Amino acid sequence: MKKIILFIIVFSSTLSFAQITLYHNVYVNSEDQSKFEMVERDYMSKLAQKAVNDGKFIYWALEKVLQPSNAMGGEVNHQLVGNWYQFVIVYSDMKAYLNAGPWWSDTDNLLGVPQELLSYKVKQGGMYLWHIKDSAMVTGAKFSAYNFGFSEEPSKFIESQKEYKVFFENMNKTNQNGRAGWVSGVRVSPKNFGEHNVMTWDGFLTLEDAMNHWTNWVESKKEYKKIHLPNGFDLKMIAAKIAETSAPSN
């Protein structure tokens, strides 16, 4: 396990189709999770909020992956052992992503806390850059259900999602089945043939709502073929929001 000084990079209530979302994954052992979450929630979220207020990006969050509770990325994702977390940052466009700079670094002046006191133990995972293509958003989601797959025709996959968008928009209006948002996107980086290159995100109000979504989901080859995803969504995750920013205060 590698000890690092806080380095944060890595979703949202108002989306435009130029938006870029960065996910930065880290693995935290069970015994280190309390400090890790405290540092991010009580300290680093303040730096993220300042960056939002300054227009560097639109949204920042830390999510804890709850499901699946098995081996992922070479580590066991289970509360008794450790969990994957992901930092989530939403930028207005690619230019904003490229120009954001090291917004997390000025802890001494902005927080009054030396950066070395905010260090913790994590194992670095990957960083994944996604382009948001469509959305049906409302506020209030506290749990995220992610679906990842590979399509040889990602543009056709995105086009196929339009009918689902209308369906989810209607559900979001009354939070039917606990729904609180939906997004579709394509991966920008890393960009390797055969790896996950399309995704959808479903927001939910409670963990029970998110788990019921899985329970009631009937998958079929026919439906996957219809959306140009022959092997289906072969990775699904449910994550809880640990900390997040709010709308700009200025």
State what each model feature region is.
Residues 3-16:
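Sec-dependent N-terminal signal peptides
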Residues 18-250:
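Short S/T/G/P-rich N-terminal loop/turn motif that feeds into the first structured element of a domain
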